Amino acid sequence: MLVLFVATWSDLGLCKKRPKPGGWNTGGSRYPGQGSPGGNRYPPQGGGGWGQPHGGGWGQPHGGGWGQPHGGGWGQGGGTHNQWHKPSKPKTSMKHMAGAAAAGAVVGGLGGYMLGSAMSRPLIHFGNDYEDRYYRENMYRYPNQVYYRPVDQYSNQNNFVHDCVNITIKQHTVTTTTKGENFTETDVKMMERVVEQMCITQYQKESQAYYQRGSSIVLFSSPPVILLISFLIFLIVG
């Protein structure tokens, strides 16, 4: 009985001390979003939350919360922290696409030809001062990359170089002519010499890579190496 009496008396005391309207969300201390005067407001501005332009609390759709589409917040327009924005996705430029093609990728529409890496145009002497000077002044108009097929499709270097020179000059001439620039007989003569040297360099590079790949295949396919690899796998698994 004594416990029941104490509990009843405590409830009556709390009812008498219950605050009148004007506490939470009225005139007293408030959460963000209440604009009534009086008391301390958190934050001090009337209306919105931290850096919010249209009222509303944390995460509200029109007051802006963390990452909300309307109003402030991290990375949203109008907030106090709008300088912290998400980085935009990098756009793939034509330079990146051209760089990928320059690594020996197969060129579409050329029947399996590949485009070699860019090279420095060789310094060539043509036997007279006029042609040497003409080449130095016009070498930028000539190709610095060659088209070629894999070396295993040719029986020797001469066949590779002959095909490489023909397709490279043809493609470069067609592409340049469409831009309104024509080549003279002197240009074609110099282009043939330049592209020939570049095709020889490309053949040597591709041949070396081809034989290295072949040597690796032969090495790993030999019986002693296969037995050694099998033994190591057995030790690891076992």
Swiss-Prot record:
Residues 18-93 are annotated as: Disordered. Cu(2+) 2 binds at H54, G55, G56. Residues 83-93 have a biased composition (Basic residues). Cu(2+) 3 binds at H62, G63, G64. Residues 216-238 form a propeptide. The keyword Membrane applies. One of its GO terms (cellular component) is plasma membrane. Sequence repeats lie at residues 44-52, 53-60, 61-68, 69-76. Keywords: Amyloid, Cell membrane, Copper, Disulfide bond, Glycoprotein, Golgi apparatus, GPI-anchor, Lipoprotein, Membrane, Metal-binding, Prion, Repeat, Signal, Zinc. It is a lipid-anchor; GPI-anchor. A lipid is attached at S215 (GPI-anchor amidated serine). Residues 45-80 have a biased composition (Gly residues). Gene3D superfamilies: Prion/Doppel protein, beta-ribbon domain (1.10.790.10). The normal, monomeric form has a mainly alpha-helical structure. The disease-associated, protease-resistant form forms amyloid fibrils containing a cross-beta spine, formed by a steric zipper of superposed beta-strands. Disease mutations may favor intermolecular contacts via short beta strands, and may thereby trigger oligomerization. Contains an N-terminal region composed of octamer repeats. At low copper concentrations, the sidechains of His residues from three or four repeats contribute to the binding of a single copper ion. Alternatively, a copper ion can be bound by interaction with the sidechain and backbone amide nitrogen of a single His residue. The observed copper binding stoichiometry suggests that two repeat regions cooperate to stabilize the binding of a single copper ion. At higher copper concentrations, each octamer can bind one copper ion by interactions with the His sidechain and Gly backbone atoms. It is linked to Found in high quantity in the brain of humans and animals infected with degenerative neurological diseases such as kuru, Creutzfeldt-Jakob disease (CJD), Gerstmann-Straussler syndrome (GSS), scrapie, bovine spongiform encephalopathy (BSE), transmissible mink encephalopathy (TME), etc. Belongs to the prion family. This is Major prion protein. It comes from Theropithecus gelada.
